[in-house]
Amino acid sequence: MQNSDDLLGAALAAPARSPAHATRLGGRELGGQIQSWKVERAYSTDLPEALRAFSGSASAQLELLLGGSGVPAPLLYSAWAGRGTGDVVRPGQSVVHRAGANGRTVPAFRGTVRSRTAASGSNTVTVQALDGAERLRGPAQLPRPYHGLRYGRPVATATWCVDELLRQGGIHSCPPPRAPAVAEDPAKPFTVLYASLHGGFNSSYGQPETLPAPAAYSWIRDGAPFETALMPKAAGLEVSWMPRSRFVVAGKVFQAELHVNTALSVGSELELKLVFDRSAGAFGNYALNVYFATGVVKITSGTVGGGGTVASWTFPKLASLKGVWHLGFTVDTRAGAVGGSTPAAVYPRLTAPDGVYLPAAPFTFTQAAALQPPSELSQVDLTTDVAVECLQVTDRSWPDGDSYTADEWEQKGRWTKGAVLDDATVPLFDLPTVAGSQWDAITEIARATLSTAEFDEQGVFRWRGPARFQSVPERPDLTVTTRRDIAALTVSEEIDACRNYCEQTYQDWTGISHTFSDTVTDTVVREIRPGASVEVAYAVAEDELDIGPPQIEDDIAPMTGHRVRFGSAATGGTSVKGGVTVGSRRDGPNYIVRFTNHGTASVWTVTKDGKPSVQIVPQKRTGDPRRRTYAWYNTTSQAHYGKQVYQAPATDWVQQRQVASDLSYAMLNAGRYPVPVLGDVEVLHDPRIQLGDVVRVVDTSGAALDTLAWVVGIRTTCAAGAAPQQTLTLRGTSYNGVPSDTGLVPDPPVDPEYGTTRTYSLIEAQHATLAVLTDSGVTYRELLRGSGGAAA
């Protein structure tokens, strides 16, 4: 239920009440012009009605009848009305509706106008609005890396996919990517890696590079910095990602960051490392090391597996104050030049659990061991002992290091949390292909995983997994009785609500890995001028998985496979390293590569012998998964109701036997006995009731029941000057016990007399003549049912 103040609670409990509402369109209060309003919410699913609380999506609808103010409403608000008045109800306009009693209201609806209809000659305009689902009408697309197949380990979960689809629609559950869009200006900020860690290592931008074993970690919600966090089960959990842009090290400001909860730990250290690909197969790095026990923060610049220089700071608060910290570091390499060794100034960035930003003086690396030769970002490594959420790396994050503000670090005013998730369930090795809108994809996931998706009255998206309805609550959110609250009540029980044999299909990915697809070799040597960017689109097949940017080859250590070489001349020249940023992204059937030259001279995509050097090597899976099924059943229920089967539709979202078992058992637990549905429950209007609430229904007049039920549908209507009417659809939290049939002897399904009638040939064999039959004195009924065998 929604929270409310004592005054509203008292108003709703009083014998008499005065209805109240407030309605804003486009931020303008129009409640006084509302002739009537109606709000409807219900779970939508393809399951039997009595089971519909267990999966599907809920999209709320608001209908308003709007009158004019001094002039007819159509003149003000029709599609052809002047923009000065008509825009307040145009399609896409914001709508906020509140309802209550005695002047106190709570949120009832938040969404956008979908349509307006003006009846000419009347004083009424009908406005229909939908909730936040309208914000998710953009095309759905999920990143599909090959690494889950490569390691045979889950790369994401259904929860992660929902969170990613929400993010695409601008609905966030944690700080968003700082600069997700590809800008024409190569000097603009750009997010090269963003991993929410909301139930998966898959990343919105970039790709996983290595995956830990599932036994080494868990996904937690309690104590997560924002929503869901990666929690190691032992110290030193390692995971790494590939950026979507291999940016050059010199001449810019870039940063890496994450959020942690130091109160949830299995050790006291964390390392976040940016690895850069140098020439001749060597690698350099900038690494942030945090020691929570001592409050020491170190930043290292050096060579992977070799020497380097370490800068150190001490923050006593880091050791003394446990909780959610925002940690990271900024690297300023503007003093370096493309093609030369690069010095850097580094800045640790910390925000404490109390919201205080901890400033620190920069440290400048000038020692020879700390200078970075020409190179490009290759990999991002994380090693952690604490709970981690929302990791991202931003190229060109700020013009300089010194003017960077605490508000910019915290992205203040740039995002609002608009989603609440559930436990990360339904692991995925290979992300299914999605189609349609983001809302369509979320609905598909909800139905496939017995989850629910909805926007509440405040416009917050809520995702609840299959465990939501499996435990009966101890006490209700509200009690309604026929003595005071209930005006009408219909209780129904149907055999269609009984499902005592539940079967779930799943995909078996055992033995399936990834392999190279058909190599695509460029046909043109491309010139990239200084300061310019060149984009090239290469066709990829629908069944091919996502790949990262090509690796950058140099002449000292030639490579094969997915790569590109930049030459100093169109005929080949010498290889150029650390001068060109290479990024990639997938857009439907196209794999788009972007080259940006940061040097002072043109370079060409050319091999040493003068041929085009861009070589794209797509990835695909080695085969298709096998379809298998898992079923749970209940023989006691089958004895009373017969076998009632539910076969879940085959879906790509169930990829483990255990998940299939969990889902089929959840459905069996919900439907092994038909649970009563309380339909058309007309109650006194209570604006606090929400979908999923538990209501205690006490009927002392008709059905004589006292039971708990979940709210799975709400319809509220109100006309000006009248009391609101609220109708609930409820699903019982449990069934009314196992049938006992006391004192009953149920008739068998087949008439016992069928097949017992004697045939003519049998009667003829027992009576030689008609006279013998007549003399026997047997009646006709006795003749047909007598002993001597059954009918043929």
PLM features: what roles do these ranges have?
Residues 1-9, 20-22, 120-151, 283, ...:
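Acidic, low-complexity/disordered segments
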Residues 446-447, 451-479:
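Extended amphipathic alpha-helical segments with heptad-repeat/coiled-coil character used for oligomerization
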Residues 3-17, 175-218, 223, 247, ...:
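Surface-exposed fibrous attachment elements
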Residues 161-165, 402-416:
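Short, charged, amphipathic alpha-helices and their helix-cap/turn boundaries
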Residues 1-401, 425, 429-435, 439-450, ...:
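Assembly/oligomerization scaffold segments
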Residues 658-672:
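Stable alpha-helical structural segments in soluble proteins, enriched in small hydrophobic residues
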Residues 413-431:
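Short, conserved helix/loop micro-motifs enriched in His/Cys and acidic residues
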